[in-house]
Amino acid sequence: GPCGPCSEIHFDLGEERDNLRGTDHVCGVNGECTRYLELWNNVFIQYNLFDDGRLEPLPQKHVDTGMGFERIVSVLQGVDSNYKTDLFAGSLEVLRSLTGQSEKEMLDNFTPYRVVCDHVRSAAFLIADGVVPGNAGRNYVARMIIRRAARFGSKIGLNDPFLAKVAQAVINYYGDFYPELKKAQPAILDNLTREEIRFARTVEAGTAHLENLLADLKSSNSPILDGGKAFDLYATYGLPFEISRDIAREQGLDVDEIAFNEAKEKHALASGGGKAMGKLGGEDAEFFAEILKDLQGKGK
């Protein structure tokens, strides 16, 4: 296929940004420290590469360029993280006000804040483009990132629906540049809240079941959770694979993604070429999870 040599544009953030200072480390482009930040990549497309290794000049040549917009902003604004730029300032402030934490407390436990703000922004743009939460393809991606944002919100004490409030900050900031966000504002806020409520109905039972499975893994000294069991968690409780994997990795374990996908494909084939996938992990899962939770509460 088309290819060619490339060049990378790096920015020297200064010696003070070398996170390995005081060691025998020597700074260098594409080195191990954080002093040099890659901002830009240019690929000079001028050849066609064949399977046998031959290179033939292309009749038309061009430059394929990729620039990290958020990295450019972080350099211009003199901050050490994309999440400390004004691109995320509004949503971070809303999130911090909801938690009641100080700025220092937020920065000391920054990962949940970053995940929520990143995922809510992504979900807002997806919904504005007509991609609502679902169980297949891009709709599954929307569902997964919304539910993952909700789970990370719970890590900072946010257990009631809150994603729409963060999304409103996203719309307020980006809306003048992307008017489709303002146009789709009702759909964005509604879909986020409904998906968050749906997930809350199932996540407690699903994560409790997952914790039991992970405890069994530890007792058997096995580091990998069977993907089929992870699929059962999704089919029964609506717990996305990515969240099961997050929880497992937090405990030094992992989930077999290949086996998960095989179980998902097998289910699709058994249910008529995937026609039943629309309900998988959705309202049916919520219904059965509610019944199971009620039975567990009664000691049955």
PLM features: residue spans?
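A glycine- and charged-residue-rich anion-binding loop/surface
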Residues: 1-300
